[in-house]
């Protein structure tokens, strides 16, 4: 009985370790890539910055991009 419990705990530890390792190896998103569905996946020097899209005053969507931290983007006409 103790052997079964010990084996179960060891298997659980191995599976947990594999999952953590897979999360750490996940590729980060480079600059200007869309991060709407994955805001935490931008590379370390970038931040996921989101903007609302409007048409005739009504919100029609949202776009998010991996952009440099601390940089301010202004609209050009």
Curated annotation (Swiss-Prot):
Organism field: Lycosa singoriensis
Signal peptide: 1-20
Subcellular location: Secreted
GO cellular component terms listed in the entry, alphabetical order: extracellular region
Keywords per UniProt: Disulfide bond, Secreted, Signal, Toxin
Keyword Secreted included in the entry's annotation: yes
Family label: Belongs to the neurotoxin 19 (CSTX) family. 08 (U8-Lctx) subfamily.
Protein name: U8-lycotoxin-Ls1i
Chain residues in the propeptide: 21-26
Tissue and organ expression note: Expressed by the venom gland.
